[in-house]
């Protein structure tokens, strides 16, 4: 039983490390801040949570203890990492950072123009 648990733990930790490695290549190779932030937030959300799940399963199966701290860490990263990536992209967009020329769609532009128009109308 313990050997099987160690294999499961190793798979989770190695898979998490592989996801983080792939995300780091994405951060280095992708063209603009928006796609880089996307790769970084996905890598941290999935990769780090897989590693923490591996640690949680190790503590549970091998040592027999359940760690609420690790579960809270998983929950914290699962919630805050996508929000942080979104806020970084939103701040970059609002400060005038341009999309890469290969980007085919700018979803935020229509909403931004609508909000600006609505603010102008409310001042009249």
UniProtKB/Swiss-Prot annotation:
The answer to whether the entry has keyword Ribosomal protein is no
Q: Where in the cell is it found?
A: Cell membrane
Q: Which cysteines are joined by disulfide bonds?
A: none
Any Pfam family from its record, for instance, is: PhaG_MnhG_YufB
Q: What InterPro entries would the database entry show?
A: PhaG_MnhG_YufB
- What are the entry keywords? Antiport, Cell membrane, Hydrogen ion transport, Ion transport, Membrane, Sodium, Sodium transport, Transmembrane, Transmembrane helix, Transport
Q: What molecular functions are annotated in GO for this chain?
A: sodium:proton antiporter activity
Please list which residues make up the signal peptide.
none
Q: Which domain of life is it from?
A: Bacteria
Ranges that cross the membrane = 7-29, 44-63, 70-92
Gene Ontology CC, one term:
plasma membrane
Task: State the membrane topology.
Answer: Multi-pass membrane protein
The family annotation for this protein states: Belongs to the CPA3 antiporters (TC 2.A.63) subunit G family.
Per UniProt, subunit arrangement is: Forms a heterooligomeric complex that consists of seven subunits: MrpA, MrpB, MrpC, MrpD, MrpE, MrpF and MrpG.
Q: What does this protein do?
A: May enhance MrpA stability, assembly, or function. May play chaperone or assembly roles for MrpA and perhaps for other mrp proteins. Mrp complex is a Na(+)/H(+) antiporter that is considered to be the major Na(+) excretion system in B.subtilis. Has a major role in Na(+) resistance and a minor role in Na(+)- and K(+)-dependent pH homeostasis as compared to TetB. MrpA may be the actual Na(+)/H(+) antiporter, although the six other Mrp proteins are all required for Na(+)/H(+) antiport activity and Na(+) resistance. MrpA is required for initiation of sporulation when external Na(+) concentration increases. Also transports Li(+) but not K(+), Ca(2+) or Mg(2+).
An additional note in the Swiss-Prot or TrEMBL entry is:
Mrp-dependent antiport apparently occurs by a secondary, proton motive force-dependent mechanism, but the similarity of several Mrp proteins to membrane-embedded subunits of energy-coupled NADH dehydrogenase complexes raises the possibility that there is a capacity for electron transport that could provide a primary energy coupling option for Mrp functions.
Q: What is this protein called?
A: Na(+)/H(+) antiporter subunit G
Q: Which organism is it from?
A: Bacillus subtilis (strain 168)
């Amino acid at each position: 039983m313990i050997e099987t648990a160690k294999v499961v733990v190793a798979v989770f930790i190695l898979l998490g490390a592989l996801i983080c490695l792939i995300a780091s290549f994405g951060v280095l190779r992708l063209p603009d801040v928006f796609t880089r932030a996307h790769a970084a937030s996905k890598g941290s959300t999935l990769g780090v949570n897989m590693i923490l799940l591996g640690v949680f399963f190790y503590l549970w199966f091998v040592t027999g203890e359940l760690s609420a701290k690790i579960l809270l860490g998983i929950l914290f990263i699962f919630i805050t990492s996508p929000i942080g990536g979104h806020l970084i992209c939103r701040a970059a967009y609002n400060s005038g950072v341009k999309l890469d020329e290969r980007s085919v769609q700018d979803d935020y532009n229509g909403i931004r123009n609508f909000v600006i128009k609505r603010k102008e109308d409310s001042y009249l």
